[in-house]
Structures are given as structure tokens and as C-alpha cells.
Amino acid sequence: GIGSAITIWSAHFADTLLHRPALGGAALLDARLYAHSLGTAVVLTGITMGQQAVALIGAGIVMAQAIAGVVAITVQYRRAIAPRLASLALHYAVALVLLATGALLGFLISWSNAHGRSALADGFYLAHTTTMLLGFVGTTVLGTLTVLWPTMLRTPMEPVAPRWTTRGLPYLVGGTALVAACGLWPPLAGLGTLVYLGGACAVLVPAYRTARRVPPTSFATASATASVAWFVGCVAVLGARMSLADDAAAAREVIHSLRLPLAAGFALQILVAALSYLTPVMLGGGPAATRATNAIMDRFAAYRVTAANACLLLALYPGAPWQVRVVAGALAALVTSYLLAGMILSLRE
């Protein structure tokens, strides 16, 4: 799942940024991955069976592996020789703290429902989903883009990017906290979104400057651009609509309405972009083989990105007939599936 992918992602980039092996190395990372999967399964089992004690144990396992990751990155950071990008690793530690917080809030949703406190459950649901989306996923992705974006474009990073990104981190956390608390007072969602997007601009403005120097023409960079656009747009809509909601239940429906664009437009697309970029790196084989793999992964890049996003927009348009929306969604999935075909073709080269 996305949690396991981000766990691997954050560990890899923390190693890269800090130039020091993580505490516990690969063994601790493997243990954390197993614990995350086990904890998630136990939580779902507990909720399905209506056993709150089982769900709490599962949430505790997820929280424990997240805190273990925080400790590993913190020790790794303290042992680093203060390289220029070391402070960016703090994004991963903060994101893991937010993951642990989100896991606890997720359990509290189940606990509230079990005790007939539906209004309280709605409030915890808002806090859980926004903490996981904006905090855990958003903070990790934005922190990583600072380093990965210029690398994907094969150009130097903007000199101000590390400093701006580090200064933007408190705004990401503060904005997430405000949006998470909107179950108490809906307008907090609008205020929190503004604060959060302000923190995101600390990453996106240097990224935009980099893109002006070297336009994103490969599939990976164009897909990443579209993914970030979906994320920013969804966060803006989320904040605006939740701030106008009558109560927590209405705000919950706002989140439900944005699940597909966030999952397909943001999460899936950023994953596809990362895999498209990393496949030539992982396969290796020398410069000639890497160029050949890049050529395969970038075939019809402009068409694939444009078609996938246009079809997704049409699939989400409520005014279109359902038959059109289904066909558009299927076409978007079909175009996106070229990634798998590209990987197979690359292996045969």
C-alpha cells in the first residue's frame, strides 16, 4: 500500500540526504514494513469483528513502527556531517510522527462508532483523513520533490530550495493541524488550507523556477507535474468546501467526493512518475541500456499524460452521462497501464 511505499521511499532518501546508514539498516526497515502490514491487517480485522481491543493492538503496532522510524532518522540526522540537504530529512521524521497520530485517530473513529458517538466519529474521521493525506503523504511527497525534481530534470537545484523547504515545514504541520481540527469549527479548514498551501509554495516556487530553466518533457516529469497540480487543486477545493460545511458529517462527505481525484490524479500518478523515472536506474546495464530504457518509458509521453488526465477529468465530471464517465475512466486506466508494458519491454531489451 501507499504506507509501505512511503516507508521505503523515506528511508532511501534519508540515507541519500544524510550520507549515513540508518540505525538498524535494512533489518530495521524490513521489520518496520512487516509491522506496518501486520498492524494494518490487525486493525481491519478488529474493526470487522467489532473488537476494539484488537483494533487498538493493530493501531499500536503501526504507531510503534512509525516511532521506530522517527528514532532511526533522528539518530541518523545527529550522526550526519551536516551536509547541505540534511535538514530535508526532517520532513520524513515529521511525516512518520503524523502517521502515528493518524493511526491513533483511526482507532478513535472505530471506538466512537462502537460507543454510539457518531458525531464524535465524524470529527475523528476528518482529523484522521486530513492528517494522513496532508501530513503523512503530503509532507513526504513535498519534501522529496525538493531533491527528486531537479534530479529528474537532470539540472542543478535552485540554491534557495533547501532553505525554503525547511522553513516551509512548520507551515505544512500547522496547516495540517488546523484542517484536522475543523470538526470543532468548519472555517478552520479554510484557514488551515491557506497555511498549508503557503508551506507547499516553499517547495513549489523553486520547483517552478527549475522547470522554467529545463522544461519537463519526459513522461516522468510531466506526470509528476500533473500529479502535483491535482494535489494542490484538491487541497484547495477540500479547504473551501469543508469550511462551508454545516457540520462534521457534511465535511466528511466533502472528503468522500474527493477520494477518486486524490487517489487517481495525485497518488497513482506520482507513483507512476516515480516508477517511470526509477525503472531505467534500477535496471542499469550501462549508458546505452539506460538510454534505450528511457526511450521506451518516454514513448508518446505528451499524449499519455494529456490523455490520462483529460479522461480522468471527464470521468469525474458530474454532468456527463454515466456511460461516458465509465468509458473515460477505463481509457485513463488503459493509457496509464503502458507503464507495465514499458517495464516488460525494458526487461526484454
Task: List each language-model region with its residue ranges.
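Hydrophobic alpha-helical transmembrane segments of multi-pass integral membrane proteins
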Residues: 1-349
